[in-house]
Amino acid sequence: MKLTRLTTDHLSVPLGKPSRVSLTDPLPNAPDRVDLLLVQLETDSDVAGLGFTYLIGPGAATVHALIQTELSALVVGEDPRETDRLLAKVEEFFRPVGFAGLAARAYAAIDVALWDITAKAAGVPLAQLLGGWRPEAPFFVSDLTGDVVKNGRSLVKQGATGVRIEIGSGDVQAEADRVRAISESLGDEVWVSVAAEGRFNLVTAQALAHFFEDIGIDCFEDPIPAADDIGYARLAATTETPLAVGSGFNSREAFFRVIRAGHVRTVRPDVCRLGGLTPLLKVATVAEAYHVAVSPVRMPEV
């Protein structure tokens, strides 16, 4: 089987509400839309594949151009089932400028389409092709607005097992108090995660982690900048609050470092930031070897 054609489409979808750093405060200059880049791959058989990537903020035009030009030339004519070899080929091509960043965002759409073709050619759902280990998976809800407790309880009744609360607007005490109120209102049976997207320094993160430890928060996600390996080591050594990291990581090597260091309980890879399912699976394999949980961020439909 060979790839014969790649076509793309660019959709710019208005957001229903501005991106937020907390339950109350929108980001300065917050993006008001999400850009989706769709890729359709055709083959010399009857099988075609669909993939997509997303951007919130700048870069969509660049990603679209990369897909249509360099990346299309790299993959058309290749066997779509050879996902590892194609990833290596693309990474080698981008070595002079680096694969992480917009190139990975662009290739993610192609890689997802490759897996779509591979599963269709095998005649099985993608989940089964990847092993089919879990018949079902728990899920949580995030970015709740309005009456957070009421809306959270409603979604829990519909099957959600937890709630993810974003913080980081600047008033640390006010947000800590809000987290406590939400956690106590939802009850012990509801899993609660607090996400900061790397907005705190180590001292503030340590204080919050101790506070969350006292009130029984289940996970503190990305409390300090992603590249601060030493900071995560110090934070993990001073708190029992489970830590998660990875929503801002742009390479699988970054995940390998934190997994091997043993500072976090959960890693949160973004399939688009990493460059697709192929690199995400490599992260999952290493995480399993070190008994670290994997909870992909965004694009749960993939």
Describe the residue ranges of each PLM region.
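N-terminal capping/lid subdomain adjacent to the active-site entrance of alpha/beta enzymes
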Residues: M1-V192, E197-R199, V203-Q206, H210-D214
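Flexible, glycine/charged-enriched surface loops at secondary-structure junctions
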Residues: T83, P125-L129, D222-A226, V297-R298
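Active-site beta-loop-alpha junctions enriched in small/polar residues
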Residues: S142-L144, E166-G170, A195-N201, P223-A227, ...
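Conserved beta-strand positions in the central sheet of alpha/beta enzyme cores
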Residues: G162-R164, E221, R268, S295
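Shared catalytic-loop signature of beta/alpha-barrel
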Residues: H210, G216, A227-V302
